[in-house]
Amino acid sequence: MNDMLFRTLLKRYEATIEDSLYKIQSFNENNIIIPEHIDITGEIDKLLLIIAESEDKVAVMRKYYGKKEAKNTEYKIL
């Protein structure tokens, strides 16, 4: 996996995690109830699943491609 692809995927998963955490925080702090989403615990459960899946993907990328990327930083993509 090349460096740019690795960084792009990493940013995607990190953004997904941040987005989900923000939504959970908003539910918690503002007591927001959206008419289409009355099942708050169900919605938070879905967001937690999204976080867990994204964290798993980041862990797998770092396990299998992280060390390779640290060694291969000689080239630049224009």
Which residues make up each language-model segment?
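Extended, charge-rich alpha-helical interface modules
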Residues: M1-L78
